[in-house]
Amino acid sequence: METASAVHVGRPTIEGAIARYARAFDFLEVIAEPGRHPRRPGLLEWRRLVPERFVFSVVVPSAMSALEHRPDRPELLSHARMVADAVAADWWLVRTPPSVTPSARATRELGALIGDLRDERRIAWEPRGLWNDEEARRTAEQLGVYLVRDLAREERTDDRPIVYTRLRALGEGARIGAAAAERVAARLADSSDCYVTVEGAGAGRVRQVLREMAGIPQDDREAKDDEQRVFGDDEETFDDEDEESGGEFDEEESHLEDE
């Protein structure tokens, strides 16, 4: 694998202090829905407490990604922009649900959403549901966005130098093992910038393998698998105290809800 200019690995959620998370990982998705992140002062503190190379990706509200016609769409977009600006996000992530299926109408509506989001940030699209490889690749190319795939299980469908991938955990206690991490590294061989979200356990191993195969020296931020608790797709709810704590929250004062 040729030396990559950037390899960013993280988990979809965190528990506790952002500074502790940033000692192990350098990539984080933030869901831009009220109650799913600290308030603006806490988000600003998150940005202040992480290294400069730490990358945030802001997940577009599900009501927008579902391409629903809602009267509060301007407010949802404004809130998402506030989150992205506060953490100086590099990415927008649009995750369309299974209800969004391949059609000319879906492509038009998705294109309109992409147009609303378009700014200096890159935009990634993660389709869930009935999109085959060619349909997803063609739509992503048409809209000028980066297609999110699970490169532990799927081959790449393009040769773009910038890659955003989600390694999905299937089943309780699922772990991304060394063999899967090596497959991902091989599929990222020709990329220059890699952004990897790891569900389930094994994110620390994935980061180590990717950095080793990219020829990047190891550092003291290598993650142990037990350093962070894994929440998978569960939701974190932040209370008002997060505004004062820079996003740090106590497990006993938070609760998780299934999506």
Regions found by a protein language model. Give the residues of each.
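Residues lining hydrophobic/aromatic ligand-binding pockets adjacent to catalytic sites
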Residues: 1-259
